């Protein structure tokens, strides 16, 4: 009897997780505005990372090529909201550490993937 109750509880928890993760998966009317559209995740950039992802030129290229956009934002240590996909700076800037541990005036001086571009503030992206 214990195992049956445990199995039912685990199954119920799994169902709850699936419901919370994808509540609109079965609702076509919520997906329709996005169907058939291409989205540039982190901007529009080539395999050579030019322009580098999450840079203003990458987002401008997405618009020029007719893509919708999706991006991630992070807070710097001084609570500036910037467009940056990763939690850490390492992959895009070569600097080790968490985005949240650096003030924006330091992050904006870190070139993205060896380019002249830097991680923009979310407010810069919106302009």
Sequence positions of predicted segments:
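Glycine-rich, proline-tolerant flexible connector loops at the mouths of alpha/beta enzymes
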Residues: 75-87
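Short, well-ordered coil/turn segments that N-cap beta-strands
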Residues: 33-37, 65-67
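Short, solvent-exposed loop/turn segments at secondary-structure boundaries
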Residues: 49-53
């Amino acid at each position: 009897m214990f195992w049956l109750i445990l199995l039912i509880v685990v199954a119920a928890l799994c169902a709850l997780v699936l419901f919370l993760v994808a509540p609109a998966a079965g609702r076509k009317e919520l997906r329709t505005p996005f169907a058939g559209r291409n989205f540039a995740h982190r901007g529009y950039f080539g395999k050579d990372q030019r322009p580098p992802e999450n840079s203003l030129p990458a987002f401008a290229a997405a618009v020029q090529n007719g893509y919708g956009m999706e991006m991630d934002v992070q807070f710097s240590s001084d609570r500036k909201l910037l467009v940056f996909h990763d939690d850490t700076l390492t992959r895009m800037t070569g600097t080790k550490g968490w985005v949240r541990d650096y003030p924006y005036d330091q992050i904006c001086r870190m070139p993205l993937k060896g380019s002249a571009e830097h991680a923009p503030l979310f407010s810069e992206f919106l302009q």
